[in-house]
């Protein structure tokens, strides 16, 4: 069972995991900026884009069979949970970990900032009614009304959306994250309504060996709203 990949450029392999509700095409606007330095590998996660539904173990095995021996790995939002889990379980393969407006746990807890689970449930309900309209509205909010023409090529399957919702609600890597010794960076947007910027202060205390970057004027999609700053950060981090 193959994972759908798109590859661009040559150089250090950089694998990109998209967020919930989207597919790998969300990365297209930044490919021209990354292509001169990296071999970009876009991945459709299970139930999204052209990748069929499968559980974590099947996804991991099939994906690793298709990837180079070593690679840098970046995950946006839900993709950050996938990226973090892969880095924890396969430290010999993942050389760098970049988490973009993501955290080891998405749902708020007594001592952990996050979002209420209802936020994702409401988003799920809206996606089920009109996916392109919902995603366009979401992007518009995150980019502060900046014009961005996005149309999803292959709508996510209902199973993919439901599985993603389960991941966002249940995956929690706060303890396992302490095992990670590879270079790791977390990027936050000060205006992000989904991964609160105050998460950064708690993470800096709990995981002092990681690097942290705060985009002062960004929300949940700094790679699109502040592409130049994002590319500069990537180039400085991946040596």
Swiss-Prot record:
It is an enzyme of class 3 (hydrolase). It comes from the Bacteria. GO terms for biological process: biotin biosynthetic process. It catalyses: 6-carboxyhexanoyl-[ACP] methyl ester + H2O = 6-carboxyhexanoyl-[ACP] + methanol + H(+). The keyword Isomerase does not apply. Keywords: Biotin biosynthesis, Cytoplasm, Hydrolase, Serine esterase. InterPro entries: AB_hydrolase_1, AB_hydrolase_fold, AB_hydrolase_sf, BioH. The physiological role of BioH is to remove the methyl group introduced by BioC when the pimeloyl moiety is complete. It allows to synthesize pimeloyl-ACP via the fatty acid synthetic pathway through the hydrolysis of the ester bonds of pimeloyl-ACP esters. Substrate binds at residues 20, 77-78, 138-142, 220. HAMAP family: Carboxylester (MF_01260). Pfam families: Abhydrolase_1 (PF00561). The gene is bioH. Disulfide bonds: none annotated. Pathway: Cofactor biosynthesis; biotin biosynthesis. The active site is at 77 (nucleophile), 192, 220. Monomer. The keyword Cytoplasm applies. This is Pimeloyl-[acyl-carrier protein] methyl ester esterase. GO terms for cellular component: cytoplasm; membrane. It comes from Legionella pneumophila (strain Corby). Belongs to the AB hydrolase superfamily. Carboxylesterase BioH family. One of its GO terms (molecular function) is pimelyl-[acyl-carrier protein] methyl ester esterase activity. It is found in: Cytoplasm. Coiled coil: none annotated. Its EC number is 3.1.1.85.
């Amino acid at each position: 069972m193959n994972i759908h990949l798109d590859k661009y450029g040559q150089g250090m392999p950089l694998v990109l995991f998209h967020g919930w509700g989207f597919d790998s095409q969300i990365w297209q606007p930044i490919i021209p900026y990354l292509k001169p330095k990296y071999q970009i590998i876009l991945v459709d996660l299970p139930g999204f884009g052209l990748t069929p539904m499968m559980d974590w173990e099947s996804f991991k095995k099939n994906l690793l069979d298709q990837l180079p021996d070593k690679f840098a790995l970046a995950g946006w939002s839900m993709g950050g949970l996938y990226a973090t889990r892969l880095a924890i379980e396969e430290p010999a393969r993942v050389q760098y970990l970049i988490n973009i407006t993501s955290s080891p746990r998405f749902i708020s807890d007594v001592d952990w900032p996050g979002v209420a689970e209802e936020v994702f449930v409401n988003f799920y309900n809206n996606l089920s009614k009109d996916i392109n309209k919902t995603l366009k509205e979401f992007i518009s909010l995150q980019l502060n009304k900046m014009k961005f023409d996005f149309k999803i090529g292959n709508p996510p399957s209902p199973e993919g959306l439901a599985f993603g919702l389960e991941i966002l609600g249940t995956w929690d890597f706060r303890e396992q994250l302490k095992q990670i010794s590879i270079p790791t960076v977390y990027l936050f947007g000060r205006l992000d309504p989904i991964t609160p910027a105050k998460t950064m202060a708690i993470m800096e205390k709990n995981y002092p060996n990681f690097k942290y970057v705060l985009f002062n004027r960004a929300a949940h999609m700094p790679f699109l709203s502040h592409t130049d700053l994002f590319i500069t950060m990537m180039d400085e981090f991946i040596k």
